[in-house]
Amino acid sequence: MRYVAAYLLAVLGGNANPSAGDIKKILGSVGIDAEDERLNKVIGELKGKDIEEVMAAGRGKLSSMPSGGGVAAAAGGGGAAAGGGGAAPAAEEKKEEKKEESEEESDDDMGFGLFD
């Protein structure tokens, strides 16, 4: 992702065809070392392509991917209906998650009561 971001920065900065050196310079300015193999792959894949078209294609792919918990909830509901004992382990998992969250919250102040 860092290589794509640096490539986009170079293109948006006016360099229509950034070289590996250009990308390394951008990444180096924020302290990131570039791996030549990955860098060359990104440059090879994006070279000569219109960035706006690449971004539009990416948005199209992302919009077609399912996101959120709707699919997981439907799958979980079907499993509980199919197996009568499927609901008990789920309840145990929820209890464990709540317990872990409360332990994490108690560690937030690390023993220092700033407002006590």
From Swiss-Prot:
GO terms for biological process: cytoplasmic translational elongation. The keyword Ribosomal protein applies. CDD domains: Ribosomal_P2. Residues 67-87 have a biased composition (Gly residues). Gene3D superfamilies: 1.10.10.1410. GO terms for cellular component: cytosolic large ribosomal subunit. GO terms for molecular function: structural constituent of ribosome. Residues 60-116 are annotated as: Disordered. Pfam families: Ribosomal_60s. The keyword NADP does not apply. Phosphorylated. Residues 91-101 have a biased composition (Basic and acidic residues). Keywords: Phosphoprotein, Ribonucleoprotein, Ribosomal protein. InterPro entries: P1/P2_N_sf, Ribosomal_P1/P2, Ribosomal_P2. P1 and P2 exist as dimers at the large ribosomal subunit. Belongs to the eukaryotic ribosomal protein P1/P2 family. Plays an important role in the elongation step of protein synthesis. This is Large ribosomal subunit protein P2. It comes from Branchiostoma floridae (Florida lancelet).
